[in-house]
Amino acid sequence: MALPEWLVKEIDGVGDHPAFAGVDELERGLRTLAAGYPEITTLRRVGTSRHGEPLLCLTIDGEPGDPTALVFGLPHPNEPIGGLTALHLAARLCADPGLRGRLRHRWRIIACIDPDGLRLNEGWLAGPFTREHYARHFYRPAGPETRWSGRSRWTTRTPTSTRRCRRRRR
């Protein structure tokens, strides 16, 4: 099955990045979008990480009755492409009313759900992109992860980031 032409154009429009974004850059990106598109966006702190970092959520309005989509980057803090992807999607949705109309959703975008973990990986985000440099600056938590740590018999306390994703807001 071939992708629709509009989607191929969206994919082709994704630019190159010489480095991955850290916590501060992702936060700055969300704040810039909220300031640039106040008529369709709301930026809200939906929680705080274990180490005191804000968990910011950018809401991009849709039409009344549209379903809500939740997008969050960095459920694994050593996979920083998710933050850039979430930020790119937010920028495209803000800039293009046609895209918003085509996708017909209200969007909630958290560019970085694990800022504590991403901070521990920031040593390799700008390179050099060698195995040695990556290994020396690599971090991945050993405990519960945002993406799968819901209520289960194996977890006693759900991480803050998971609770913030699950919380419903009107």
Model feature map: region roles:
Residues 1-56:
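Short glycine- and acidic-rich boundary segments immediately preceding or forming the N-terminal edge
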Residues 46, 74, 111-114:
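Active-site-proximal beta-strand/loop segments in catalytic clefts of secreted hydrolases
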Residues 49-51, 77-80:
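Gly/Ser/Thr-rich loops at beta-strand to alpha-helix junctions
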Residues 57-65:
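Short beta-strand-to-loop junctions in surface cap/lid or active-site-entrance loops
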Residues 67-76:
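Short beta-strand element of the alpha/beta-hydrolase
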